[in-house]
Amino acid sequence: MAKEIDINKLLAQENNALNTILSQVNELCEQNKKLQGLIEIQNETKELEKEHNRSLPWFKRLVKTVSNVKYIFVKSEEQLTNEAIKYNNKILKDIDNKIYNIAEKSAPLKQELQEEIEKNFKDLTKKDLSKEQRERLSEVYFSYKSKPERFSALNMTNPLQFIKAEELEKQYNSLNATKQNIQNLISENSNIKELKEIQKQVAEIREEIPYTFFEKLNNIWQNVKNVFVNNSEQVLAKNKESNTRAIRKIDEQLYKTKHKFEELIENKERNINDIIAKLPDNEELQKIVSNLANHMTSKKEPILTTSSIAKPLENNVTPPPPLTKNNIPPPPPPPPLSKNNILPPPPPPMPTMAPAQTETLSKPVGVTTTVKKLENQPRPSIDTSDLMREIAGPKNLRKVEKTDVKTQDSRDLLLQSIRGEHKLRKVEFDPNTGKPVAHSHSKPAQNVSKPNGVASILARRVAMEMSDSSSSSGSESDSGNWSDASVNSNKPKALKTRGERDAKTTTHAQKILSNRSSQKPSFVRS
């Protein structure tokens, strides 16, 4: 209730402007009185002039009267000349601007105005009108909802303010009419399911600045045409001709609108450049000029995004290091010695390459053979640490004597085992008590190539032969001097003194030495 009181006060203050609107409506009716229906409207206008109470209901009656005048002009447009049409549109435009200027002063009044215009439009479209007349009426209807001040009052600072707002307003009205034509076309072909989804998208387009409005509407229109092309068999026969005319007309409207936008943008660019040329040079101004140039370039020639540029394939495999001559990798440094400076045993010898393979490697690349390059494959690494240890070798090397395996007998194998430093412990007996004497472990022979070592080996060999002969015959066991001699427990043995045993051993050893003095033993170095 309080809102209506405020609206009534505002209308009372705008009494002169409202009277001017009534006089302009009477003028239109008088100039076009030959058109059917204008006499009734003129009578309604006189009724409004007689009422001095300017209230909200009175304002709604005024808006409805103006809407009826537009309806008659649209319905009877064929009876008017081009000059009459231009004159009528000019007067109607002035009336619309005055009504909007009054409504702008009160938000509740502006809302009431929008609701009343929408209601009148729906009522008028239900009347007997052709398709072209409904399209024309939609253009007139949307002229109610726009005014030049809305575009000239954009949040921009001078001199970037839109000076020719009327041109933008015309494009805005044209786009609204095109939107309505698209909706009418979709409604007439509601049997196509794909168009129902597009119809929702068209209805959801918000009123905004004309150029973005055009972009959204144009994208949706392209989808509509694609639906008609892909579903041509679903189009009813009675709608084919009307659809063709409607599509052609909408295409022409969008083309003209786009061309006009491009012209306005080019003119505005020239105006901005002229204004900038008159200003003093500074860094901020140069940034504005650069941004403007980039913006205009992006509009005319879209720049490819970074995502559209093909990137080179990334290879995370690191290439192997280049090989040295003969394709043999350089050996790594030798491993550090242990605490006791003892190197591990040498590894087995490296496998040798086949002759064919060595010939292939020795030939130059590209002359007689072609070598395929392995890409993105790691080359096999060769561990040469054992090889270096073998080359370095231990500090004290021992000469290894070559022996013929075929000519070796059991005795030679025994001598080799003795050279291998098998530890035999000699047991000595006390001549007084006849008991073994405890000694510390005897050190093994360290150098088998010395002459005194040969005599000791012969003595051990004689002892082993005597032990074997005595154990096989069962007469006696010569195990007095060795700890590992076998004892025959089946026959009793006669105990001998140490002197007898030593004399027998010495005599037997001398016989063997005399027999072999003429030939060189196999274990003595040549």
Swiss-Prot record:
One of its GO terms (cellular component) is cell surface. Homodimer. Residues 481-491, 506-526 have a biased composition (Polar residues). GO terms for molecular function: actin binding. Residues 383-400, 410-427 form the WH2 domain. Residues 305-356, 425-452, 464-526 are annotated as: Disordered. Residues 464-480 have a biased composition (Low complexity). Recruits and activates the Arp2/3 complex, which in turn leads to actin polymerization, promoting Rickettsia motility during infection. Keywords: Actin-binding, Repeat. The keyword Repeat applies. Residues 318-352 have a biased composition (Pro residues). Residues 448-484 are annotated as: Central and acidic domains. The lineage of its organism: Bacteria, Pseudomonadati, Pseudomonadota, Alphaproteobacteria, Rickettsiales. Its main location: other. This is Arp2/3 complex-activating protein rickA. InterPro entries: WH2_dom. It is found in: Cell surface.
